[in-house]
Amino acid sequence: MSRYLNARIRVVRRLGPLPGLTKKITTRNRYPGEHDKKPGASSDYAIRLEEKQKLKYNYGISERQLYNYIKKARRMNGSTGVLLLQMLEMRLDSIVFRLGLASTIPESRQLVNHGHIRVNGQAVSIPSFQCKKGDLIEVKAKSKNIIKTGSNSLPLPKFLELDQENLKGRVKYIIGREEVGLNINELLVVEYYSRK
């Protein structure tokens, strides 16, 4: 998967706050670039593209992964946009981030890739692993000294519970739309992909 390795604050200035990408907030109230071009009237396509980019950058996923999540959400029963957000939020890297074990989703992805996280007692090194209701997420005993709890400034969501002493968390239920920590209109993302 190709990752975004350039300046993250530039993306935040363009798209707005993205808690999964970086903790930093922008102090400049203008668009990135040398000459700070004022945005003209956005077309419908530009608005939909911007919402799609928010999802892509916040969760650190590629275009193909996002498209595959859209296709999977379309095949399921329910609102496609809400199902898409649920699948993205129930990824293991996103759960580790929301538990406060990492300050950003890229950091939580690295923790998972390096084998520091266990799910239901089994070592899992796949960041896209889909967590389910009742799953127990814990840090390996040998890895507890590298984890800084509370490095994430976001409050713990209601669908998760965390034991900070033992660095264990549990998924109480599948996340609802109102608990997603990202300001996004998921219907515009679905409309963007409906043309493909």
Which residues fall in each region the model found?
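Residues in the helix-turn-helix
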Residues: 107, 123
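Beta-rich strand-turn-strand
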Residues: 102-105
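Ferredoxin-like alpha/beta domains used as RNA- or RNAP-binding modules
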Residues: 1-99, 126-196
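Short, well-ordered loop/turn sites that connect or cap secondary structure elements
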Residues: 111-112, 131
